[in-house]
């Protein structure tokens, strides 16, 4: 799956911030392509063994920072042009 590379079990700080950081790094390195759809919050939570709230907070931070966007009834997508 798309988030198979994520490993946030070990580390310091809030889990949602570690998830956010790893997704951001994956986008910048090209592992996750621009325009690509992220797994639903429910799917990502199940895959990563995290709460839905944790995944939702990470996704919301991605949107606030301009890395992702939420499209109603479609899901979360990596922006075509990442804002800095």
Residue ranges and their predicted role:
Residues 1-84:
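N-terminal basic, amphipathic alpha-helical segments
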